């Protein structure tokens, strides 16, 4: 279950301007990612694992950095049509921005990119029964790993856990 949570791209919903000069792609200060995050997009080379009821399809609600360097992920995923809340700990590895967790095999979760305020992208590698699965988020990053638009799922339109808690209120009609 823990692996599910990390298998997605996370994007912080914020009313701030994106500045490409603040994007980090190495030497991460992971303590700065603690806070409320919302899953926006997921991509995988095995779409069955991130489709509805897939074992890697999760909706992250919160990430907390621990003093020992590990990360706590608070997320929901679907079990028999119901959103189930789960909290998992991913152990820090020797590599900067990389974590490990056992779930449906051995997994590594690594920060791929972040600006610490508006978005963060995690790259998950799952090794199970001799098969390796890659899962990540945000279209721009996906292409770097050979995952095209056909491998991407928009969680904001399709995920019942997302719509249950985080759907934007209806906007008033525009007046011309």
Curated annotation (Swiss-Prot):
Write down the InterPro entries for this protein, in alphabetical order. Calycin (IPR012674), Lipocalin (IPR002345), Lipocalin_CS (IPR022272), Lipocln_cytosolic_FA-bd_dom (IPR000566), Maj_urinary (IPR002971)
Any one Gene Ontology cellular component term annotated for this protein:
extracellular space
UniProt-recorded Gene Ontology molecular function terms: small molecule binding
Question: What are the disulphide bonds in this sequence?
Answer: 83-161
* Keywords noted in UniProt: Disulfide bond, Glycoprotein, Secreted, Signal, Transport
Glycosylation sites per record: 68, 129
Q: Which residues form the signal peptide?
A: 1-15
Which compartments does it reside in? Secreted
SUPFAM superfamilies per record: Lipocalins
- The source's domain of life comes to Eukaryota
The family this protein is said to belong to: Belongs to the calycin superfamily. Lipocalin family.
Instruction: Identify this protein by name.
Output: Epididymal-specific lipocalin-9
Its source organism is Homo sapiens (Human)
